[in-house]
Amino acid sequence: MKGILVAVSPEGIIGKNNSIPWHYSADLKRFKRLTTGKTIIMGRKTWESLPIKPLPERRNIVITRSSIEGVECFQSIDDALQTCEGDIWFIGGAGIYEEAMEKADIIDMTLVPDKVNGNNCIYFPKIDETWKEGKTNQLDNHLKLKHKMYTLSLIHI
């Protein structure tokens, strides 16, 4: 399985000023549960925004043109994928998500209610017709958060 794991505002925003503009422990716990023991692939700015580096109990991979001490780095997602076994999560940012849309099997999306505006906002890429939208459900009994899955349309597989 290769999946995109993302939290998105109603405006489609995934970040602002190189950070996530909301904090929900239910979403963070879910992120940890889904990614522990798996490979996570991210861009350099996502890596730099992490409060703990590397994220423990996961194989951390950063896509960057330069090397970063303490983490595996590759110049492309394709180069990284050649070294991966098992489940893989693409965890951001926007450029990684854009490229991962052609490589992933699922999009696992948390819908946050927070309205975000202003400058320096980062948006999730457009989800095209190759993806089939699933139902929107409440996330883990959390009153504010919703969850939605997208899978590749059988027509396009």
Where are these regions (language model features)?
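Enzymes that bind and transform nitrogen-containing heteroaromatic metabolites
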Residues: M1-I155
